[in-house]
Amino acid sequence: MDPTCSSECIYNLIPSDLKEPPQPPRYISIFKATVKDDMQKAKTAMKTMGPAKVEVPSPKDFLKKHSKEKTLPPKKNFDRNVPKKPAVPLKTDHPVMGIQSGKNFINTNAADIIMGVAKKPKPIYVDKRTGDKHDLEPSGLVPKYINKKDYGVTPEYICKRNEEIKKAQEDYDRYIQENLKKAAMKRLSDEEREAVLQGLKKNWEEVHKEFQSLSVFIDSIPKKIRKQRLEEEMKQLEHDIGIIEKHKIIYIANNA
């Protein structure tokens, strides 16, 4: 029997819609993940345009001449008195081998860690959101000076300076008082008063005698000047004699 006869059917005469063949699976490279990772590594955020907000440089920090040049390290002076390092051991010297120690380093280290004092972290402060850290102690944020015992106390050198100034002022005042006492008024004794009075009278007599010896006619300028001078001297001497005779007690400046 013909095998094609079994496939014959009346329904095969009905025209059927053509079906498109299924598409093959989409190609996916096996290196896709590797390529993505390489691209992410090569990229950097804000690399071409820079960060959004940047601190503006201060005009005081301008670029100075030779500031970009490399500076040599400070020169060290060679000291010949410094002892030399120990010599390198010879090739023939062999170190002692086989020495062993019975110390248990594991237990020793564990005991040192348990009994030791924990290391305190260094105090710092952060001033930006990006995490810039600085030492806290030299920043001035810690009230270090107001907690000192000698805070608000006058320094010792100022107290010493004030004492020296006070002592110098006292010495100066004492010197002035001594000079005032030396220059104080002293009283004339009766003998001294009488001697002064007699001396003034004697001077008056001499001036009066000279005045009496003048010519009768004063017909020249020198004669007039001489007469006026003698009259003034006699008048001053008479005034002094009158004061001394009037006052029995007289004080004079002590210039000794």
UniProtKB/Swiss-Prot annotation:
Its main location: cytoplasm. Residues 176-187 form the IQ domain. A motif (SH3-binding) lies at residues 83-89. One of its GO terms (biological process) is flagellated sperm motility. Residues 160-255 are annotated as: Interaction with TRPC proteins. Expressed in airway epithelial cells. It comes from the Eukaryota. Disulfide bonds: none annotated. It is found in: Cytoplasm, Cytoskeleton, Cilium axoneme; Cytoplasm, Cytoskeleton, Flagellum axoneme. GO terms for cellular component: 9+0 motile cilium; 9+2 motile cilium; acrosomal vesicle; axonemal B tubule inner sheath; axonemal microtubule; sperm flagellum; sperm principal piece. InterPro entries: Enkurin_dom, Enkurin_domain-protein. Residues 160-252 form the Enkurin domain. It holds the Pfam family Enkurin. Keywords: Calmodulin-binding, Cell projection, Cilium, Cytoplasm, Cytoskeleton, Flagellum, SH3-binding. One of its GO terms (molecular function) is calmodulin binding. The IQ motif is involved in calmodulin binding. PANTHER family: ENKURIN (PTHR21490:SF0), ENKURIN-RELATED (PTHR21490). Microtubule inner protein component of sperm flagellar doublet microtubules. Binds calmodulin via its IQ domain. Interacts with TRPC1, TRPC2, TRPC5, but not TRPC3. Interacts with CFAP45. Adapter that functions to localize a calcium-sensitive signal transduction machinery in sperm to a calcium-permeable ion channel. Microtubule inner protein (MIP) part of the dynein-decorated doublet microtubules (DMTs) in cilia axoneme, which is required for motile cilia beating. This is Enkurin. It comes from Homo sapiens (Human).
